[in-house]
Regions:
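Canonical Rossmann dinucleotide-binding motif of NAD(H)/NADP(H)-dependent dehydrogenases/reductases
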Residues: 16-47
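Substrate-binding pocket helix/loop in short-chain dehydrogenase/reductase
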Residues: 111-116, 120-125, 222
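Short C-terminal tail/terminal secondary-structure segment
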Residues: 111-113, 164, 242, 253-281
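Active-site helix of classical SDR
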Residues: 139, 175
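Alpha-helical segment proximal to the catalytic Tyr-Lys
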Residues: 144, 188-189, 250
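Short, small/polar-rich loop/turn modules that mediate ligand/substrate recognition or access, typified
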Residues: 191, 196, 252-254
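C-terminal helical subdomain
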Residues: 199, 220-252, 261
Length: 281
């Protein structure tokens, strides 16, 4: 029968990712880690970014142990100078940049969901900085390098929270929705340079963050309200990222792809204040 290396080689050729140079931001754990690993399996050389050196180095080591090429690049993506230095390092050590997957972005510590009237300036500033601003800084630095190379593909990981009202989570949902709109503007501007820009929005995914934030009762309620009666898995999102950044999607740009097991279709999804382990009132 066919061996796994042979199958992966065929996949790499088919997807057009063989020998591509890739940066994956926010790839030290969870969804970002899985995306970095799948892109490497498809034949790419991957730069793994995370704020924590131990996590970036661990994922890069996993990829290397699997027989692919990877380096760790540590940077705080809220710092424009650090982002520029990170992208320059990727270009120098890998040889260029063809694909960028920006998974960096989160709900900052201490900014847990709360009623809209309890959001203050510092909350808005931190949440927008950690989600919209980091996306813009990374996207700009990546696009500049891709323009020099004659094209590329940029993918942003946003959130299913941008597709419906998100009570008690207004700031995060608004920041992620802004990234979706940023994608359309970038796609129009960068298209003539051969650069595609897209976003994918995961539904509730079983990550360490979700496990820590939601009670078992809330997670059960979310599953029950989802048409497919399940949460999204890391590897499903990773495979979608491979598709969107590959040659199979070379006519797709400026798009926002929802991957939520059908949660968007449900009208009975629990509000964000139901089942949180941390109090918001």
């Amino acid at each position: 029968g066919r061996t796994m290396p042979f199958i992966l080689l065929r996949m790499a050729v088919y997807f057009g990712i063989t020998f591509a140079y890739i940066i994956a931001t926010g790839a030290g754990a969870g969804i970002g880690r899985e995306i970095a690993r799948w892109l490497a399996r498809a034949g790419a050389s991957v730069a793994v970014n995370d704020l924590r050196p131990d996590r970036a180095e661990a994922v890069a080591a996993e990829i290397t142990d699997d027989g692919s090429t990877a380096i760790a690049v540590v940077a705080d993506c809220r710092d424009e100078t650090a982002v520029d230095a990170m992208v320059a390092t990727v270009a120098d050590r890998l040889g260029g940049l063809d694909i960028a997957v920006n998974n960096v972005g989160m709900l900052p510590p201490g900014r847990q969901p709360r009623p809209f009237v309890r959001y203050r300036y510092d909350d808005w500033h931190d949440i927008i900085d950690q989600n919209l601003v980091v996306a813009a800084l990374c996207g700009r630095a990546e696009a500049e390098l891709m323009i020099e190379r004659g094209g590329g593909s940029i993918l942003f990981v946003t959130s299913g929270e941008t597709t419906r009202p998100s009570p008690y989570n207004a700031a995060y949902a608004a920041a992620k929705a802004a990234v979706n709109h940023l994608v359309t503007s970038m796609a129009v501007e960068l298209g003539p340079a051969g650069i595609r820009v897209n976003a994918m929005a995961p539904g509730t995914t079983m990550t360490e963050t979700v496990a820590a934030a939601f009670t078992p009762e809330r997670m059960a309620a979310i599953v029950e309200a989802t048409p497919l009666r399940r949460m999204v898995e890391h590897d499903e999102l990773a495979r979608l990222a491979v598709f969107l950044t590959s040659d199979l999607a070379r006519c797709i740009t400026g798009q926002f792809l929802l991957a939520d097991a059908g949660a968007f279709l449900s009208r009975s999804r629990p509000a964000n204040d139901e089942g949180l382990t941390s109090p918001i009132r």
